[in-house]
Amino acid sequence: MEIIYCKKWWFPRKKPIEIFNEETARNNHLSGEDYTVVLKQNDMVSYVVEMAKNDVFVHFMNDNEVNYITYAFHKENDKLFLNAAYYHSYEAEKEIELMVFGFKQNGELYMEKRDLLSGEIEEREAVVDV
């Protein structure tokens, strides 16, 4: 697996912006500065991990190197909490549907399903006993 450290991943162009070495990434991590880690398998981008001061975004890429799942975590008291999950559906490389799941630590759950072709939005809310 190849690891690339950079300032940001440019999703539309499928390329890193401002590549740097592991030491710079480590220094950014320790100082709370944003950076991105790109993981490639067989010359294809498989995962993009965006590190921010209190947030981590893990993007799973499909065979076209397009983001199809994102998990968003929030860091609080040295613990990560999954606060959102995004599922993207595509036809060819055109995004046609987005599902968003939002989570709160008190057990509240929010779901939104967006049909990006018709503009229709379906929403649901629930509370889960935690």
Regions found by a protein language model. Name each.
Residues 1-130:
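Buried hydrophobic residues that stabilize the cores of well-folded domains
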